[in-house]
Every structure is written in C-alpha cells, then in structure tokens.
Amino acid sequence: MPGLFQAEGIVLKSRDYQETDQLLTILTRTHGKLEAIVKGVRKPRSSLRSGTQQLCRSRFLFYAGKSLATVTQCEVQEIYGPLRQDLKRLAYAYYLVEIADGVVMPGQVNQAMYLLLQQGLEALGELEPALVARAFEARTLKLLGLAPRLEACALCQRELKGNGRVAIAPAAGGALCPECRGHQGREYLVSRGGVKTWQQLNRLNWSYLKRLQINPMLMGELGEVMPAFLEYYLDRRLRSRAFINEIGGDNIDGPGKNRPVAQAPGT
C-alpha cells in the first residue's frame, strides 16, 4: 500500500528518467532491492543529488507508490571517496555492485548480501582490489550455498591425490578427479596453492585479508575460475569484468593465462 518508509541502502544503478528525474536501483538493508524515482535530481540545486549517486550508501525516506517508490529525502552515510579517486578501485566497485545486483532479486530482502557489499566496498578503499574481488566472490558463493567442493571430486567423491594441478568445473560444482574430467563443460586448471588460497578466502574475515600475502600467480588462477563460477550460477555475463580488463585492473592477478582447458562435446 502507498505510504512512507525509511531504509538504509546502497545505490547500485542510476539512469536518466524524463527531463530532470532519475530512476535508481537501490539495495536496501531491510526492504530488499527496489527501484525508486528521484524527482528533479538532475537540476543543479537539487538537495538529493549527493546522496543518490551510484555507489552512495544513504538513509532514504521513500514514498511507496502503486508501482514505483519515490525518494523524498536522503541522508548520506558513506560516499566511498577513495573509490571515486582511483579508476582501478572504481572499476572493481562496479564489479561488486554488479554481482550484488545479480544475486538479489527485486523485492527480495537479503541482509547478508547487503552487509557483504558494504564490507566489500569499504575494503576496496584500502586493500588490493583484485584480492577484495576474490574474497567477495568466494563469500558470495558461500552465501548462496554454492561454495565449490575442492577437497575431493565433486562428482564421485574420490580424494584428490598428488600435488599436480586440479581441474575445476563450474558445471560440476567443484574439483574433478582424472576419471571424471572432460564431460562437465569448461574446466579450469588450478594449482594446489590456488585451491588452498580459495579455501582460505572462504573463511577469513576482512581484517585478516590485510595480512594475507598475495601470490600473483595464484591470484591469476583464481581470477579466471572464480568469476566463471558466479557467471555460471547467475546465468549471465558480468560485463564489468571487461572494463577491469580494459584498464589493466587485474594486473596483480598475474598473467591471466589460466583459460578453460577442456570442453565437453556439444557445449
């Protein structure tokens, strides 16, 4: 029903709407993901402009209309200034926002994803962006109940023996033993060190990431396979990855040569 309500939220997207308005996609902490109109915000003297920019975290007062909400007031909580001053950090911020937008459906309340996005944006202001992205990917998959099985074959449950590279396939939900390889679509070869790093990212808190030693080669492996898992389960391309690659933002991830190594016939 129509009426006023308050919510803290992060602006995921904005686009021009009519002559002076904008239409925002906002992930709120308590009311899920919603679309809201901000009337007159493109006018030079609009008091709503500062708190309704993309990537802003603000406290909003909404009027719930029959089809769309309208932002009537907003109070800025965080603008994430360091991200706006560094193109690489900004590119990764767009990437995190795109993941959150894909995970949360319209109207769905997902406080855990909201807090994860808030923490990820804060971490981007001080940590290596590629490391933050890998941690964010790992935690998003875990939050969705989709964390891959890495300690044994995801299909036959055989223990993965030896010290060689491990084949990991998004379609299989994790690692594959030699007998199960070649039939699960795209597979990525990841070193044992890369697998261990992924497992660490699943359980480490943000503060510990500051002390984590970054191995560029291992991060390069994970920089291919972890986004592939998210894209597989979201069933969509993460377009902001192209922007990151375009500006060389993944350089810390190493040479980036861990491309898919096998593909099942007909896929």
UniProtKB/Swiss-Prot annotation:
The keyword DNA repair applies. InterPro entries: ARFGAP/RecO (IPR037278), DNA_rep/recomb_RecO_N (IPR022572), NA-bd_OB-fold (IPR012340), RecO (IPR003717), RecO_C (IPR042242). Signal peptide: none annotated. One of its GO terms (cellular component) is bacterial nucleoid. It comes from the Bacteria. Keywords: DNA damage, DNA recombination, DNA repair. GO terms for biological process: DNA recombination; double-strand break repair. PANTHER family: DNA REPAIR PROTEIN RECO. Belongs to the RecO family. NCBIfam families: reco. Involved in DNA repair and RecF pathway recombination. This is DNA repair protein RecO. It comes from Moorella thermoacetica (strain ATCC 39073 / JCM 9320). The gene is recO.
